[in-house]
């Protein structure tokens, strides 16, 4: 009797699995095979080689989109003719990915995203296994232009360099005992808070005004006890059109800096620093 009860329980435990399992679910091998035409399609865009398009698509496939109020309907050969045989000039900035792939039996659908500098293209592919080989039967797509950067954003590389230069002026002002570089890189309403560790290992905070920093720069390394080429590692974290943040690792420790643009010039407004952290 005990054996019968266990047997019945085992059957009951299996039944839900049998009921919910999709008998047509694709195996890993089948999924990998269905990815091949999708990868050929991506390779066509990456290399500009039209032969990848011919490998990816069924010969009678259609490529369609609704653009400028009209239906665009291309044959495979018409679509392949758009590939020049070489990568795009901005290929290094282009990204592509297979977002999803769903297969049932010998049919499937996939979504591919082409993320380009000026536009994002979304492809929806219908796939079919024909004579034992997966092919793209149909493609519909939508392209969405990206917002053009503002004039301020367009200056970002220059701004980033200007932010880095302001931090460099600050650290080299101290290394080279040159107060003038504090004057050109630090705002006079500076807020500076430091944490210095004493001999007992306790951090003690203290504040410094702009004038105190200016005076310190003139005397801190006046005797040249610290080499002018001492550590000055600068990492610019973020630059917006008006504000920025950066990190400085120097001889005295670590500084986290906020900067703002005044009359077109980047100036340090806040500094939070500490002596070298405990190892």
Functional labels for PLM-detected ranges:
Residues 2-7, 127:
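Sec-dependent signal peptide recognition
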Residues 5-15:
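Bacterial N-terminal signal peptides
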Residues 15-51, 55, 143-180, 184:
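Short, low-complexity N-terminal intrinsically disordered segments enriched in polar/charged residues
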Residues 41, 53, 61, 110, ...:
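Hydrophobic pocket/interface hotspot
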Residues 57-59, 67-68, 114-116, 125-131, ...:
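A mature extracytoplasmic/lumenal domain signature
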Residues 62-67, 72-120, 191, 196, ...:
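Surface-exposed, charged secondary-structure patches
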Residues 71-73, 134-136, 202-207, 266-269:
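Tryptophan-centered short beta-strand motifs
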Residues 109, 120-148, 245, 254-279:
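Short beta-strand edge/turn micro-motifs at domain boundaries
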């Amino acid at each position: 009797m005990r054996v019968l009860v266990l047997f019945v329980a085992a059957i009951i435990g299996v039944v839900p699995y049998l009921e919910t399992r999709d008998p047509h679910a694709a195996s890993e091998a089948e999924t990998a095979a269905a990815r091949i035409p999708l990868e050929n399609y991506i390779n066509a865009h990456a290399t500009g080689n039209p032969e990848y398009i011919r490998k990816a698509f069924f010969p009678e496939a259609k490529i369609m989109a609704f653009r400028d109020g009209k239906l665009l309907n291309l044959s495979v050969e018409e679509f392949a003719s758009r590939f020049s045989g070489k990568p795009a000039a901005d290929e290094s900035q282009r990204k592509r990915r297979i977002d999803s792939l769903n297969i049932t039996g010998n049919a499937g659908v996939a979504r591919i995203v082409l993320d380009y500098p000026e536009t994002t293209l979304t492809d929806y592919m219908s796939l079919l296994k024909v004579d034992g080989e997966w092919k793209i039967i149909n493609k519909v797509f939508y392209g969405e232009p990206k917002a053009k950067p503002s004039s301020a954003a367009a200056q970002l590389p220059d701004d980033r360099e200007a932010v880095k230069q302001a931090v460099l002026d600050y650290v080299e002002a101290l290394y080279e005992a040159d107060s003038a570089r504090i004057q050109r890189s630090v705002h006079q309403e500076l807020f500076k808070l430091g944490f210095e560790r004493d001999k007992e290992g306790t951090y003690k905070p203290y504040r410094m005004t702009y004038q105190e920093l200016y005076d310190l720069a003139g005397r801190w390394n006046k005797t040249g006890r610290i080499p002018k080429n001492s550590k000055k590692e600068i990492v610019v974290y973020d630059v917006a059109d008006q504000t920025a943040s950066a990190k400085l690792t120097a001889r005295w420790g670590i500084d986290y800096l906020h900067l703002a643009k005044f009359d077109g010039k980047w100036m340090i407004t806040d500094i939070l620093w500490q002596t070298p952290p405990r190892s």
